[in-house]
């Protein structure tokens, strides 16, 4: 039988994008390493604004089907914009751009070290990253088996509002707290409201999570103390004491952006959660807790120090989790492709 040879290089005919894909505790991250033009702007927020206004077609191309999916997440590496940083990053998802992403930081550090983009010897290395939420200090190190692990100290995180309630259309009265951990989240006790945080209840979690987000957005004004661009509610996080790992403190299910479900416990989400717990006197400084996810992934988070940020009293969270590279991809834009902007199905 005659064999067929497929020419692998199409880049001379089509515009291409190269990515390295990874996941942290089950949540995907698509690291874009080539294909974008120069990202203009002197600050990371200016760069995000430039991408939003001029290059959003590329986000849709790489996040949406048929190249991505409704729950895809991306990281676009930029040059550093502060003297301390090694590089900058913009985070992408199905709806737009986030201010910070904990699982993304952990996966990005793993990718940068495992591909030797950052040299990691035998000693732990500090890596500083410009994000829209602020400067992130990550640490890469080798464990006792020589495997690369990562953790990061997040931006100032705080309890923004406690013991609030809102009437949610089609569901009823919901009690919630609001915390900031690089993004704002509404936290809802799923057990109190009779909502299962299991994988078999994803449809209800998405539906109610979106309803809660919209209800809170309509009734509660968020004002970030420094950056207006960060003054928005990113998602709803359901918390539950019903865990599968006996060492876990609780379970998180985060519904964010346009109904995305985080497979991980959510790095910024566990950061804001530990700030809420500290504000309520339910956790002490430097006391790590494990939070598990809807797919039984887990992150370890602690309040490493108290902090004060422009009048907001909070903590500096430290977060760790496991990340793994899953593939390297070269995506093309056929100029005749009728779905260059992609699409989303649920």
From Swiss-Prot:
GO molecular function, one term: trans-L-3-hydroxyproline dehydratase activity
Organismal lineage: Bacteria, Pseudomonadati, Pseudomonadota, Gammaproteobacteria, Alteromonadales
Pfam families: Pro_racemase
Keyword terms, alphabetized: Lyase
Species the sequence originates in: Shewanella pealeana (strain ATCC 700345 / ANG-SQ1)
InterPro entries recorded: Pro_racemase_fam
The family this protein is said to belong to: Belongs to the proline racemase family.
Catalytic activity: trans-3-hydroxy-L-proline = 1-pyrroline-2-carboxylate + H2O
Name of the protein: Protein Spea_1705
Record bears the keyword Lyase: yes
Enzyme Commission code(s) on record: 4.2.1.77
Role summary: In vitro, catalyzes the dehydration of trans-3-hydroxy-L-proline (t3LHyp) to Delta(1)-pyrroline-2-carboxylate (Pyr2C), albeit with very low efficiency. The physiological substrate may be different. Displays neither trans-4-hydroxy-L-proline (t4LHyp) epimerase nor proline racemase activity.
Binding site for substrate: 102-103, 262, 267-268
Active-site residues annotated for this sequence: 101
């Amino acid at each position: 039988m005659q064999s067929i040879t497929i020419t692998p290089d199409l880049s001379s005919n089509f515009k291409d994008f190269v990515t390295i894909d990874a996941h942290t505790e089950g949540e995907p991250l698509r690291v874009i390493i080539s294909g974008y033009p120069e990202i203009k702007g002197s600050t990371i927020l200016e760069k995000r604004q430039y991408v939003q206004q001029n290059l959003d077609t590329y986000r849709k191309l790489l996040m949406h089907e048929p190249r991505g999916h409704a729950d895809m997440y991306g990281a676009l590496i930029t040059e550093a914009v502060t003297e301390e940083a090694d590089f900058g990053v913009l985070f992408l998802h199905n709806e737009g751009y986030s201010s910070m992403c904990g699982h993304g930081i952990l996966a990005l550090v793993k990718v940068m070290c495992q591909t030797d983009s950052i040299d990691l010897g035998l000693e732990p290395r500090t890596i500083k990253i410009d994000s829209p939420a602020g400067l992130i200090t990550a640490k890469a190190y080798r464990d006792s088996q020589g495997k690369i692990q990562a953790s990061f100290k997040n931006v100032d995180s705080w309890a923004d509002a406690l013991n609030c309630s809102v009437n949610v259309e089609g569901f009823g009265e919901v009690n919630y707290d609001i915390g900031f951990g690089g993004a704002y989240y509404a936290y809802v006790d799923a057990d109190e409201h009779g909502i299962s945080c299991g994988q078999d209840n994803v449809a209800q979690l998405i539906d109610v999570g979106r309803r809660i987000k919209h209800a809170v957005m309509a009734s509660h004004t968020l004002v970030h103390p420094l950056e207006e661009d960060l003054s928005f509610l990113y998602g709803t996080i359901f918390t539950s004491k019903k865990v599968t790992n006996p060492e876990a403190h609780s379970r998180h299910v985060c519904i964010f952006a346009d109904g995305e479900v985080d497979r991980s416990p959510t790095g910024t989400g566990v950061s804001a959660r530990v700030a809420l717990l500290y504000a309520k006197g339910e956790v002490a400084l430097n006391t790590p807790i494990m939070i598990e996810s809807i797919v039984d992934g887990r992150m370890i988070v602690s309040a490493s120090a108290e902090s004060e940020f422009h009048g907001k009293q909070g903590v500096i969270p430290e977060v760790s989790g496991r990340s793994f590279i899953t593939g390297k991809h070269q995506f093309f834009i056929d100029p005749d492709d009728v779905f260059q902007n992609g699409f989303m199905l649920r």
